[in-house]
Amino acid sequence: MSQPALLKVSQARKVFGGLVALDNVSLSIEAGQIYGLIGPNGAGKTTFFNVITGLYAPDGGSFQIEGRPYQPTAVHRVAEAGIARTFQNIRLFPDMTALENVMVGRHLRTHGLHQGVFGAILRTRAFQQGEARIRSHAHALLDYLGIGRYADSIAKTLSYGDQRRLEIARALATEPRLLALDEPAAGMNATEKNSLRETLEKIRDDGKTILIIEHDVKLVMGLCDRVTVLDYGKVIAEGSPAEVQRHPDVIEAYLGSGATHG
């Protein structure tokens, strides 16, 4: 018996006034995939992310996590369902250290239940032990993302690429089932993009599932297992990267007539 999809979205709909931003969008992401979501500017990609991560309430559709109904109506429910995301514009705590940023993510995962208010005030043994575990886990994630040497550096002093990696480390600290990345390669040079690709492949190979929005078509096609293409809020193609690149509607709407060459 086959396992249910990690995330299944059916007929998702979102309307802003008279604008239909998502027009019955459906997709299914299997565990262990890197899944790409692409399309022209204004196609509905970020709106879709905002719906499945609880920032926008959907106006229609059904959502499932591993076959169970999922209502993305609030950010805390999204975290409980096992979805973590990054944003197109970096949203770190700029004046905190890299280590502290990741520890914040870990605190979200543990909900602070190991300490309680009085434990934090009195710095009880349980509080101190919990903090030590969180700190150790955060160090391990920074090492995993290749930025362990910057643990004590202030986040805003890191390079752009390393700030992106720090965002991913913080998201991974919540131990998500699905890691949703909104344009993680934005602003990166070619070397940084190659490093990002290797990092995401490692995360996938270690058992995580990734959903990625990205404008760099070459990166998406070389990285993703499956790709969905949106245009004006509608799905116009879905399949393997090779299938999507050959789809005439995709070529016309997004990739350009030379996309299948070179």
Segments predicted by a language model, with ranges:
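Glycine-rich phosphate-binding loops of nucleotide-dependent enzymes
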Residues: 2-262
